[in-house]
């Protein structure tokens, strides 16, 4: 990513104003509006109930719902001459040209109708008089109903225009992500040749998308079908991709300043964002081979169709960036640090704990960005290999995809009536326990020191003090949960988590900043450099002595942003600078930082997901999924084909896009073969976990690199070049040898041993 502070004049100033202020402010307003939409129904229901309690009068039968609008005087005539009105109506009936066809009413029928109308009119006047008296007796009702109806108007507008809000958010976020070179790729561009290849690829990709959006608009326009509000969405797509094309064209002509010299043409292709590859691939196929240029634009419509899901994803991303502004992760690690655990054991505990925030941030990889750097630093400083620490960082954002309230499972349940969220979350716990246990077993197998722990007499008091320090944050969580539960009659679940988590984290950030909390405590240094206990692969594990633990050296990986460079890690003993910087950041500055980061991640992730759906659409139109055999008699063979297909799909597609494709194509075929729906989706979900950490996409590895920094990852790779194959590529191999056996166990064991009553 480029440093926005490098150039604050001319176009650089305009870019800075757009990315740091205009788009940040607009997206913040849209996120807050999304929060209002999400909580609007529950809040409005409470406002109506409160209005009834305050202004309702059971004695007179007056309800607040009658008074939400100013009472209007009835237009009917209150006092009439009944006989005269009856004669007038009889004459009018006689003059009716259809009277002979329907028959003429008798005088008694006409009189009854007139009397009934007079009674209704009198009741209207009585209600009007009673309502006016009630309003005059409660003058504050006008102010209250103005507030209540105004809130309802905002809520109603937002609910009816979710798709429009999402597309506007994506427009601002995607432009900012492009200006900041924030799109997700295998590595960031850094050399002159990197930027040249990057810019040309982005130009071609965005040009395809712009042309496809225009083709779709023209197709709908020529069809004569009324577009309604979709007209604005079509225009926004065309504006977005036209703007991105112009930005890419400018970057081709005037390339960003390289951050280092050298580079090669082949390696430069690693700098091209994944969404650009997807856009070019689908654009070429749809336009030139299928004569379907509007294909990409049509599949972008999936974002509109599932606008609620993607708005929730945006809220989860915001929650993750707010988490990054808190000390929660570091304070949790403070509880573990005194025990000086072996890196493998420490990592296992971190992964267990990380699964919950991963699920509560939508399983979108946002937790890796929010906490990846501190997890990496903690595992490495505990004595773990840097490659092992990188693997742990990537896996910290994948194990939670099967836990409540993961957004991915909500998408699965919404597209497949055969399963429910409760069923998937229930069996997801078994998947989580299996995969996390396998991680512990396999990582201990490759560990240099199998076991290490500090003396409980030393560690327990320190750990207890660290737990006491985190109690206020637990109290904040409980108070907000109780407020939603009892004040708004809403519990925390997979449907309300996207709305509640940003509110909880906003309060935690505010709490941190009001208390002027110091910087996070530094991580424990390498054990073998500081402690007297001799711990190596041949020794018997020992407890650390009190003196050794007391004299342990504490280090903080000082991450400094240097102009034009990625995050550089200096493992010197430096702590004061970070502390002072964190103390100077107030609440509003933290809000600005978190929202600005949210903008970039929304732009990068949502566009990637949209193009992933487009790739799924291409595969669907190529009828690749229809190649799945339909005459197989062996269930084991069917399961094997599903496993292979899920691994393939997980490797090349974002899970949110893959769910849409699989639900429409593979799932119905699997059900026909007798594969239990829950079993099928457990295989699919563990396949997505594997896909998160498996090349060529390996999204969590890319996000971990983004969090930790290219320079640090390069150093980690460089220091193991002389070692064996496994240790050279441990960050790629370890997640695979953990999750692949887990997937095979989940795929075959329930069928072979007839578990859970899924198979007769």
Label every PLM stretch briefly:
Residues 2-760:
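Alpha-helical transmembrane segments of multi-pass membrane transport proteins
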């Amino acid at each position: 990513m480029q440093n926005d502070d490098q150039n604050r004049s001319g176009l650089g100033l305009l870019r800075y104003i757009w990315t740091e202020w205009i788009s940040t402010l607009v997206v913040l307003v849209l996120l807050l509006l999304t929060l209002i939409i999400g909580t609007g129904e529950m809040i409005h229901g409470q406002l109506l109930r409160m209005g009834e309690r305050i202004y309702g009068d059971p004695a007179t039968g007056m309800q607040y719902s009658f008074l939400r609008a100013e009472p209007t005087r009835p237009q009917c005539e209150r006092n009439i001459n009944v006989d005269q009105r009856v004669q007038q109506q009889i004459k009018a009936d006689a003059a009716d040209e259809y009277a002979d066809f329907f028959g003429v009413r008798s005088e008694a029928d006409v009189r009854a109708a007139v009397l009934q109308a007079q009674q209704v009119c009198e009741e209207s006047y009585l209600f009007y008089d009673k309502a006016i008296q009630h309003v005059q007796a409660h003058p504050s009702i006008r102010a209250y109903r103005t507030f209540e109806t105004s809130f309802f108007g905002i809520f109603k507008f937002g609910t009816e225009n979710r798709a429009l809000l999402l597309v506007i958010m994506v427009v601002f976020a995607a432009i900012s992500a492009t200006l900041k070179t924030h799109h997700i790729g295998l590595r960031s561009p850094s050399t002159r040749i990197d930027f040249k290849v990057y810019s040309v690829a982005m130009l071609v990709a965005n040009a395809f998308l712009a042309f496809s959006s225009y083709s779709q608009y023209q197709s709908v326009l020529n069809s004569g079908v009324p577009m309604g509000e979709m007209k604005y969405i079509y225009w926004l797509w065309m504006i977005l991709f036209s703007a991105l094309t112009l930005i890419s064209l400018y970057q081709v002509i005037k390339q960003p300043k390289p951050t280092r010299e050298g580079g090669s043409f082949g390696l430069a292709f690693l700098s091209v964002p994944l969404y650009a590859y997807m856009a070019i691939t689908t654009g070429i196929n749809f336009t030139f081979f299928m004569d379907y240029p509007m294909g990409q634009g049509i599949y972008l419509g999936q974002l509109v169709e599932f606008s609620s899901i993607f708005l929730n994803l945006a809220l989860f991303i915001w929650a993750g960036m707010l988490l990054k502004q808190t000390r929660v992760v570091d304070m949790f690690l403070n509880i573990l640090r005194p025990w000086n655990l072996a890196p493998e054991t420490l990592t296992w505990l971190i992964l267990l704990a990380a699964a919950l925030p991963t699920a509560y941030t939508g399983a979108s990889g946002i937790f890796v960005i929010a906490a990846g750097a501190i997890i990496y630093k903690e595992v490495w400083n505990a004595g773990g290999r840097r490659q092992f620490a990188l693997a742990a960082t990537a896996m910290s954002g994948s194990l939670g995809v099967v836990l409540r309230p993961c957004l991915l499972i909500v998408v699965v349940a919404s597209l497949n009536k055969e399963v429910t969220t409760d069923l998937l979350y229930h069996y997801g716990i078994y998947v989580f326990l299996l995969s996390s246990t396998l991680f512990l077993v396999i990582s201990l197998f490759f560990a240099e020191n199998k076991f290490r722990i500090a003396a409980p007499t030393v560690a327990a008091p320190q750990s207890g003090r660290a737990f006491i320090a985190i109690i206020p944050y637990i109290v904040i969580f409980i108070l907000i949960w109780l407020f939603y539960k009892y004040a708004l009659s809403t519990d925390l679940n997979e449907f309300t988590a996207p709305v509640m988590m940003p509110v909880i984290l906003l309060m935690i950030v505010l709490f941190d900043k009001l208390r002027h909390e110091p910087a996070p405590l530094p991580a424990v240094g390498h054990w073998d450099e500081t402690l007297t206990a001799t711990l190596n692969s041949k020794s018997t594990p020992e407890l650390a002595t009190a003196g050794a633990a007391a004299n342990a050296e504490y280090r903080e990986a000082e991450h400094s942003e240097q102009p034009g460079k990625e995050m550089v890690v200096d493992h010197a003993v430096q702590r004061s600078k970070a502390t002072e910087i964190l103390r100077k950041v107030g609440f509003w500055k933290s809000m600005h930082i978190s929202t600005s980061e949210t903008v970039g991640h929304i732009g990068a992730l949502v566009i990637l997901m949209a193009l992933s759906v487009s790739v799924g659409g291409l595969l669907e139109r190529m009828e690749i999924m229809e190649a799945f055999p339909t005459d197989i008699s062996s269930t084991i063979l069917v399961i094997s084909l599903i496993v292979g297909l899920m691994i393939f799909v997980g490797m090349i597609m974002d899970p949110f896009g893959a769910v849409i494709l699989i639900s429409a194509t593979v799932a119905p075929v699997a059900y026909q073969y007798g594969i239990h729906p829950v079993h099928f989706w457990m295989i699919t979900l563990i396949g997505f976990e594997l896909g998160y950490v498996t090349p060529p996409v390996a999204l969590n590895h890319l996000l971990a690199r983004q969090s930790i920094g290219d320079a640090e990852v390069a150093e980690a790779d460089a220091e193991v070049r002389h070692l064996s194959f496994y240790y050279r590529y441990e960050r790629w191999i370890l997640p695979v040898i953990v999750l692949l056996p887990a997937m095979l166990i989940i795929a075959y064991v329930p069928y072979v041993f007839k578990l859970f009553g899924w198979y007769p």
